Regions:
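Active-site loop of short-chain dehydrogenase/reductase
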Residues: 4, 53-54, 81-82, 126-140, ...
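Conserved glycine-rich cofactor-binding loop
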Residues: 12-14
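Conserved glycine-rich Rossmann-like NAD(P)H-binding loop of the short-chain dehydrogenase/reductase
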Residues: 26-43
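The beta1-alpha1 cofactor-binding region of Rossmann-like NAD(H)/NADP(H)-dependent oxidoreductases
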Residues: 38, 59-70, 102
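Conserved NAD(P)H cofactor-binding loop of Rossmann-fold oxidoreductase domains
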Residues: 88-93
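Substrate-binding pocket helix/loop in short-chain dehydrogenase/reductase
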Residues: 96-97, 101-109
Length: 192
């Protein structure tokens, strides 16, 4: 992928941080979105800038559509263009059929599905007829279903469908792909 003007949601930690590091370079601009990981975002910014990358940070709560709608215009203004959107941010909280609730279910859908949908919509508007890439980070759970992490799994399955339908709609200029990583090291909120 030869992207030079990249947006990465949830780019400050874990997979997002690894993606940013792998795409960094002298002629690359990256907008790193974060919500609660300001310190990690600032540290990553310094690391990437040492590699010659121009880095811009934006804080946004992806469960708030008004904040979501500020990300693409901010990125376009800072980078003077766009050619790649990586929808990496996600909410991953344990629940199941017996104990899920409206608040958690809605928040999973807002962050893991609704935010990427609005970001894709805005990205397409700014890219117009240029060639570009959209990458949605899905999850291997979508292909290997279990009854655990109920709200998360349903939201990621919907993101997989969003990926397929937007790929059909935006082809051939904008290529849309999904990546479904397997297990990663646990985060501080997860148990063994």
């Amino acid at each position: 992928m030869e992207a030079k003007k990249i947006i990465i949601t949830g780019g400050a930690t874990r997979i997002g941080s690894a993606i940013a590091k792998s795409l960094a370079g002298y002629d690359v601009d990256i907008v790193i979105h974060f919500n609660k990981s300001k310190k990690s975002a600032q540290q990553l910014k310094m690391e990437l800038e040492e590699m010659g990358t121009k880095v811009y940070l934006i804080k946004a709560d992806l469960s708030n559509v008004n904040q979501v709608k500020k990300i693409v215009p901010f990125a376009y203004k800072k980078m003077k263009g766009l050619d790649c959107l990586i929808n990496n941010a996600s909410l991953f909280e344990k629940d199941d059929l017996e104990n899920f609730n409206d608040k958690s279910f809605s928040k999973h859908l807002d962050i893991n599905l609704k935010a990427p949908a609005f970001l894709i919509k805005d990205f397409k508007r700014y890219v117009r007829n240029k060639e570009a890439n959209i990458i949605n980070i899905i999850d291997q759970r979508v292909k290997k279903l279990t009854p655990f992490f109920f709200s998360y799994t349903l939201s990621k399955a919907a993101l997989a469908t969003l990926t397929t339908t937007t790929a059909m709609k935006l082809a051939p200029n904008i290529r849309v792909n999904g990546i479904s990583p397997g297990p990663t090291l646990k985060n501080k909120r997860q148990s063994e």
